[in-house]
């Protein structure tokens, strides 16, 4: 689930909610059909040499009064590496092996010239009775972190079944329940939910160092190889293909757009960026970095509007209009004021502080004390302090009592919006994967896992940024459509920051026309809010329609 700025990554690289490298190897030779067993449990295979059995089950779902028949496939694909071709040059390798271990590795490699490196767990949904399955759209989905499984999208967004929440996304009392998803996308696209290595049930093989998968480029390469392998195993090279990432998953998706084209010649029809962060400079609150203070301000305003903390004239406006006014101020007067720093005249500083107070509901005195800068953490703990409540980071509609009411302490607070969904989704998945998908494993399903230190490679001490990967892919592929979803109450990946990053990609007019933004009155996981989930599906239908109904583009006309 979470996406964390660099200063917090060392201790917090866990979940939710980032082109280079060689391949894991040539396509595996086993026929997929030989590994499938309908409606029978698939036990985790501890032998690295064996191809795991996939559990395939048949289901029927009613959507808009019509039966939707489909098959679900749960299990692993094994990522393998050709000798002398590491995933990414300079990536972490396995610890030094003994002579006996080396002999075993040589024996395994001798079978097909490939060494098993990791098992990637996935759940795929494929519609039945399709005239030409090869032509049916296929959407690959993953969450972020880094260190998050795909459970959030899988159990709350577009799969056929979902964890039951209230219409606003609140958790009901346990025991939790599953229900049919009225907003599933399966009537429009087949779906594949991917758990990156070290998350969910995905693991490296014995003697393999998980760190070789824990990095910006390493992660992109491993998910890219999974997509290639799944596409080949299931004869889907001619299918329209979409990649959907959420949070840090958008960082990964943008990187994949260029990697898949360059490494495998796999050109996508669309990229969906849910709660986008392509440039981590927009999230890192430091005194010398003005970007996050500017980028978060409109989200502070919409959050304050939701909690009725603004003046009467602003409260009377729709949230979209409040967002527009805050954008204008943030991108003009506020940007200039921060740029002037210590040279800003006192009178102008007073004026800016008053405007900041007007848009955020926080006292002007607080802004004056803090050089006109309020971080996200301070905002979470300050807006409702007089009520002894804190805000949700992922969804600022959610509030909770403070750990230390009646004090100014704000350390070690929790996220009420995270707590609202983690329990229901985790319980729902662990029951669903066994009871309905017939997949068995005794290892824990890691919804989030600490994958630090995360290797940011070329970013070094700078900021990870895959916006340029996306720019290159869009420039080379004129048919690549990009859809960015933004939420007004998302205080993890603010909408104005996402807009600014995309606006700075230096695209020509024709290429820029392939971009679209949609907005939701929800939080980071927009789909837990029932009205937003319904809108999300409708917006996907419009996006898919445009992505699949394009006319050939003459290169001379570009």
Label each PLM-derived region with a short phrase.
Residues 10-21:
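Bacterial N-terminal signal peptides
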Residues 160-164, 257, 261-360:
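A catalytic-pocket lid/entrance helix-loop region that shapes and gates access to the active site
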Residues 185-189, 196, 213-232:
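Alpha/beta-hydrolase active-site loop
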Residues 255-256, 369, 373, 480, ...:
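Short alpha-helix in the alpha/beta-hydrolase fold that links the catalytic acid
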Residues 337-492:
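Alpha/beta-hydrolase fold catalytic core
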Residues 521-532:
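Catalytic histidine-centered segment of alpha/beta-hydrolase-like enzymes
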């Amino acid at each position: 689930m979470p996406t964390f700025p660099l200063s917090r990554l060392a201790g917090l690289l866990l979940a939710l909610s980032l082109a280079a490298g060689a391949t894991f190897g040539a396509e595996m030779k086993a026929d997929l059909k030989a590994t499938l067993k309908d409606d029978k449990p698939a036990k985790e295979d501890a032998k690295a040499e064996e191809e795991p059995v996939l559990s395939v089950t048949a289901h029927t779902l009613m959507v808009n009064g019509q039966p939707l028949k489909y098959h679900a496939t749960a299990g692993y694909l094994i990522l393998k590496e050709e000798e002398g071709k590491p995933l990414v040059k300079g990536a972490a390798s396995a610890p030094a092996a003994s002579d006996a271990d080396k002999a075993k590795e040589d024996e395994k490699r001798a079978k097909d010239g490939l060494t098993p490196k990791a098992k990637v767990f996935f759940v795929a949904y494929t519609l039945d009775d399709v005239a030409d399955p090869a032509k049916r759209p296929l959407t690959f989905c993953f969450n972020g972190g880094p260190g998050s499984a795909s459970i959030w999208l899988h159990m709350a967004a577009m799969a056929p079944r979902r964890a039951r929440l209230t219409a606003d996304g609140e958790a009901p009392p346990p025991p939790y329940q599953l229900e049919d998803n009225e907003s599933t996308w399966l009537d429009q696209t087949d779906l594949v939910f991917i758990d990156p290595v070290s998350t969910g049930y995905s693991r490296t093989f014995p003697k393999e160092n998980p760190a070789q998968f824990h990095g910006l480029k390493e992660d992109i390469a491993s998910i890219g190889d999974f997509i290639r392998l799944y596409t080949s195993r299931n004869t889907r090279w001619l299918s329209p293909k979409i990649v959907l990432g959420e949070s840090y998953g958008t960082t990964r998706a943008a990187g994949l757009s260029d990697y898949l084209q360059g490494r495998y010649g796999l050109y996508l029809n669309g990229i969906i960026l849910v709660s986008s962060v392509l440039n981590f400079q927009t999230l890192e609150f430091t005194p010398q970095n003005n970007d996050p203070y500017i980028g978060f301000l409109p989200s502070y305003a919409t959050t304050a509007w939701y909690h009725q903390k603004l003046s009467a004239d602003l409260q009377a406006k729709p949230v979209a209009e409040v967002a527009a006014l805050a954008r204008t101020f943030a991108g003009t007067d506020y940007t200039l004021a921060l740029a002037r720093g210590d040279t800003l005249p006192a009178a102008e500083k007073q004026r800016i502080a008053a405007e900041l107070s007007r848009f955020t509901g926080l006292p002007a005195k607080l802004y004056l004390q803090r050089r006109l800068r309020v971080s996200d953490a301070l905002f979470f703990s300050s807006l409702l302090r007089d009520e002894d409540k804190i805000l949700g980071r992922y969804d600022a509609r959610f509030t909770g009592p403070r750990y230390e009411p009646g004090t100014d302490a704000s350390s070690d607070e929790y996220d009420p919006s995270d707590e609202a969904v983690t329990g229901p989704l985790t319980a729902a998945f662990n029951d669903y994967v066994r009871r309905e998908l017939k997949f068995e494993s005794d290892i824990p399903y890691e919804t989030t896992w600490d994958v630090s230190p995360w290797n940011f490679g070329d970013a070094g001490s700078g900021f990870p940024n895959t916006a340029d990967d996306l720019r290159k892919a869009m420039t080379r592929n004129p048919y690549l459509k990009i859809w960015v979803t933004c939420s007004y109450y998302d205080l993890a990946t603010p909408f104005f920051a996402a807009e600014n990053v995309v606006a700075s990609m230096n695209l020509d007019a024709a290429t820029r026309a392939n971009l679209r933004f949609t907005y939701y009155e929800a939080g980071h996981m927009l789909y837990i809010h029932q009205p937003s989930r319904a809108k999300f599906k409708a917006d996907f239908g419009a996006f898919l329609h445009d992505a699949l109904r394009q006319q050939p583009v003459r290169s001379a006309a570009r």
